[in-house]
Structure formats: structure tokens, C-alpha cells
């Protein structure tokens, strides 16, 4: 994906440095999901990345004066692996903060709350995560959902079908290979509208605890964490985050 990588380097360098020809000495490598998660991050009609996280990271870069070089990966697991292995300095990729992940990474102040179990299905019997015990469930490989579904299915007859992207997880439902695709409500609900000709419906399990998205940085990198936290605090105070949330999630309560 060299085109996207080059495009975002130029865009974020300009944001961080303004009209100056000189950029900051510190260049931070950020890894993100490939833009196919409308409205979180996706390609617009001109072929340029856009969406909630795309606009937010640009605002953060501007506020914190960070020079960021972006790279996109399709597999969620590759996002965290790259950060853990030192191939990136930070990751912004619909990453929920969990105790297990906090053992490996440091996290910034959360910027978005999500319902972690949203389903795309044709099956009217699926209402909550407990209904997946005996179902064929398609999940994004490396996501937080994969392990949780496996735990639910320990006493059942269901199975997990790994998918390299959330689009492929939904495609498995469309093609009848899976009963349901599972993900966060931040990006799953849109699929029911986009592919309504396939009689898909979106269901949110509101019995589960909400989770929070945050930016992950390498363990111990308190300097970068503070820069981002300070930027997020200012963007919260001046209403930028609320404005972006209303823009991309107008029906969210």
C-alpha cells in the first residue's frame, strides 16, 4: 500500500509543520487499519482516506505538532504485532483498552466509547453474545472478539471462522459460510445498510459492558503518550472531538 503511505506522510508532515519547509526532527511511525471501516476509516469517492479516526489523528498531529508517517494493515493482529515488535511508535486502529493489552502497551486517554458486540446476521434468533454458542461466527483475526467467542463456545457446538478483514467476515455471512459476523458497533452497523439487498440486519448486544478506544504506544514511552494526551485534552475542551463524533455518528446517543 505505498500510495496510501506516501500520501499520509505528506499530509501529516504539512499538518505538523505548517507552511515551513522544515519538519520536526522526531518522526513517529503510526500504524492503522486499512481504510474500509466506514465511518471510522474508509476511502472516499476520490480514493482518499477519510472518516472519524482519520480526521481525529490529523487534529491530534496538528495540536501536538507531531510528524507522523502512516502505514495501513488489513489484519488487526498485525497492527498490535508491529507496535510490539518496534516497527511502529503508535497505533490507532479501533483498539479497545483491555487489561491484557495494558500489560504490553501503554494507552492514551480514551477518545471513543463503543459497544463491543454488534452482529451482522440474517438469523433472527441472535440477540446477545450468549446466542453464539452454537453458531458459525466470523470474526476479524486478532481482534478482541475472537477469544471471547471461543470462550462462549466452549460448552457449545459453534465454531469461529477467522477473517483477515471485517469486510471478509461480513462477506462470509452474505455467502452463507457463517451465521453471524461480530465486531464493534463503531463500524459494524454500516454494513447492514450497505448490503441490505442481502437481507442483513445489525444487532447490538447492550447487555455487555461498553469499551473504550485509545491510541496505543510502546510500553514506557511516556513522552509520546503525554504529547497525545495533552492534545486530546485540548481537543476535548475546545469541542473538536464532540464535533467529529456528531459529524460521523449523527445518530449516536
From Swiss-Prot:
Asked if the record carries the keyword Transport, the reply is yes
Name the family: Belongs to the bacterial solute-binding protein 3 family.
Keyword Ribonucleoprotein annotated: no
Indicate the secretion signal residues.
1-23
Q: Source gene?
A: aabA
Gene Ontology CC entries for this record: membrane; periplasmic space
Record keywords = Amino-acid transport, Periplasm, Signal, Transport
Q: Which InterPro entries match?
A: Iontro_rcpt_C, SBP_3_CS, Solute-binding_3/MltF_N
BP GO annotations: amino acid transport
Indicate the principal place this protein occupies in or around the cell: periplasm
What Gene Ontology terms describe what this protein does at the molecular function level?
ligand-gated monoatomic ion channel activity
Q: What's the protein here called?
A: Amino-acid-binding protein AabA
Location(s), subcellular: Periplasm
